[in-house]
């Protein structure tokens, strides 16, 4: 029975079905939540900097495809090669978002999980005029920004835009990144923080300073997003507190 379940989970038809259902559910969430934008002119602020690097926290990224509100907002999103990532990739493609497969990690795992190839592909995508969206923290180190995204900004010359999207209704899982599954029929907020530019000759000390600034900014915009939907510090409270109600 275990082998049968494993075969089904890995089958292309099952993964496509899950991707379709996930995309349909996310559309429902986006269309049935009353979204506000902070600042109100966030797109007018960031558009002159496009193509840009959109930074989110792990576990707070399910609505990332909807940062694209115009055709000029071409976006590719970084998604891991893990089996769970396959579902996310298929859902993103259903939502007409390009994908780059690979993930950030530590030490040799960076090579094994396709980090080097993904880094080069992200630089190329930015050169081709695509915005790139990715999580700033790497697996098992929730809410700690890695240097990878800072290196991407230095290499590409593009600006980092820290973003957070929250809904008043959600499920929060008991895992390392406190994954938040956004739910329909509530309020939503998209919050942008102060943009970060990395000079091409940035020293290691400056890189660390900018990494810490990105981390602080992402925490700030995430807190603001949840406060605006009436769920102050929703994802940063104790894990596993169930559903948030709008």
Region annotations inferred by a language model:
Residues 80-127:
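Conserved nucleotide-cofactor-binding alpha/beta core module
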Residues 115-156:
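Catalytic-site beta-strand/loop segments enriched in glycine and acidic/polar residues
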Residues 78, 102, 135, 162-165:
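Generic beta-sheet signal
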Residues 144-204:
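A cross-family acyltransferase "interaction/gating" segment
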Residues 61, 139-141, 168:
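Solvent-exposed loop/turn segments at secondary-structure junctions
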Residues 57-61, 81-84, 185:
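Short glycine-enriched loops at secondary-structure junctions
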Residues 1-68, 72-74, 90, 96-98, ...:
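Membrane-anchoring hydrophobic helices of lipid-metabolizing enzymes
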């Amino acid at each position: 029975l275990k082998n049968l379940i494993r075969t089904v989970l890995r089958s292309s038809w099952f993964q496509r079905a899950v991707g379709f259902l996930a995309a349909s559910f996310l559309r429902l969430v986006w269309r049935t939540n009353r979204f506000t934008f902070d600042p109100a002119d966030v797109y007018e602020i960031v558009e002159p900097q496009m193509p840009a690097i959109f930074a989110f926290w792990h576990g707070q990224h399910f609505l990332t495809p909807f940062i694209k509100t115009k055709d000029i907002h071409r976006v590719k999103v970084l998604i891991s090669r893990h089996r769970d990532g396959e579902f996310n990739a298929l859902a993103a493609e259903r939502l007409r978002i390009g994908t780059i497969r690979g993930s950030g990690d530590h030490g040799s795992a960076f090579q094994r999980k396709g980090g080097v190839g993904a880094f080069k592909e992200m630089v190329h995508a930015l050169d081709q005029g695509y915005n790139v969206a990715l999580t700033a923290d790497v697996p098992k180190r929730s809410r700690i920004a890695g240097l990878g995204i800072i290196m991407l900004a230095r290499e590409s010359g593009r600006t980092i835009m820290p973003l957070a999207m929250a809904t008043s209704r959600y499920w929060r899982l008991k895992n390392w990144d406190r994954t938040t599954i956004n739910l329909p029929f509530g309020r939503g907020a998209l919050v942008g923080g102060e943009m970060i530019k990395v000079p091409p000759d940035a020293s290691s000390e400056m890189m660390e300073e900018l990494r810490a600034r990105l981390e602080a900014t992402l925490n700030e915009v995430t807190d603001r997003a949840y406060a605006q939907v009436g769920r102050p510090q929703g994802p940063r409270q104790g894990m596993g507190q169930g559903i948030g109600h709008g």
